């Protein structure tokens, strides 16, 4: 991780703390608010109810920990196979030794959104900390349900926003309008829609890698949030990973969870949740890293797969570092497309051949650490990573943002002023919303460290200092503009220490039911070839291609949203080779209000612009 400066942070730097954090670490995390959705803030203090195991002991004879809740019930939810909603009666096999977890009684209580009045229900599920030793410690997973508009829904659809480290509870808060009145209203007419916080995240048993004083310093602008882009050698990165893990160990209430936040464990949690809502098969919508989670679930539980949509897919064959490198390559290619489309325009500062333009921009950015850009009244300044983040957010969003990037680059390169660049990216006060709150900063920090914990655990320790340093040098050559946003994660995980003991799950399976994969042709976070690679590994799957820029099509592209809705409602699959066109440009009177329809990959949160779908996974 990288602290961007050693001197006290400027106002621009403090605004960029969360931006840098997620821009450098969170590859595919939360998606943009959809065009059809009504954005709503995360409900604070939502009441989470507990579960009661229906056996006094688990299979090993040890009593799992329990929490209490109200006695309100889930109602008559049925699995996609028509089974009843009582725990353990879905017809799917219960893994040996986990009977008590699969048969616990799930209770729901009302937890309405205070801002919108949306009638959510909340619950918690108890799961083993370590599935290899289910008689040991337990943890909880938090769920939030948007109940179906049908009195007799056919089942539930679970959501994951990506990350890893993204909050499904935040996603259901934000996307409720998409299901209530938007393009996925057919889903809500047939299913309950459930967001959940994966283990270690949010309202589930969390990791905590910071003190209250650390958070307050970030809120006040006295400190920057951490970044995984540590300057210097691989040795410096290893040391940073070690310090971060020690901090997590110190402040996390259940520190053992740092060894059990892998994707395999999250997928097993989902199977417990599937059983507890009474579904024979898992119905699931996963974005970005959530596609990898869905693919791992399909590999582990091929007979329990219902209707599964994997949007903006990861390539399940990539290594830990390979996903970062694939992102950077896609971003560089999108930048080249941008440059080629703008050359010849009056005042454009990157004319000449494309290679010459890329070199000119890279050289300019490389000089910003020694001579930062000024911003606004001169009290702010921007170094290389900060300016590169702003460029990236504008270039990867969509071509309609490229004139704004032209304006920002022209001012930056001709007048050494970063004001237009930051303003057009939405990173200045008044452009990105009010000041970040403590709760929002904590959510970001959890997603960042949740990302580290998951990606480090999903792969064994890999490489050595010489190979890591060689990779860092190659990034500067191969990704001349965006190399400063590529972390050396293998080195970081070596220092972090909580790494995988086995190889990643080998996804190569025929699921019982067909899986729908949605791939975006111009996706800079999870490049389109990754979706094709996933389809090749999920042999009973179908690919829907979407001709748009951005990350995450469902809820943003009207054609893709309709196809996903039809798949969940009717089981309808796209024809071979089917491509959804980009949305038509709206007329001025049809433009969405502020905060709605934010370009995929960029969502403003509390004055700190946060690139939410930007790196590795």
Task: Tell where the protein language model's regions lie, with residue ranges.
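Secretory targeting and sorting signals
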Residues: 1-41, 125, 270
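Compositionally biased, intrinsically disordered low-complexity segments enriched
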Residues: 6-10, 15, 29, 64-90, ...
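N-terminal non-cleavable signal-anchor helices
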Residues: 19, 39, 52-53, 423, ...
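Gly/Pro-rich cap/lid or specificity-loop segments adjacent to the active site
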Residues: 90-387, 453-617
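Extracytoplasmic/periplasmic regions of membrane proteins
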Residues: 49-52, 62, 67, 105-110, ...
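Alpha/beta-hydrolase-fold enzymes
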Residues: 344-453
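C-terminal region of N-terminal signal peptides and the immediate post-cleavage residues
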Residues: 28-62, 80-89
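Intrinsically disordered low-complexity regions specifically enriched for long asparagine
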Residues: 53-57, 66-71, 75-99, 124, ...
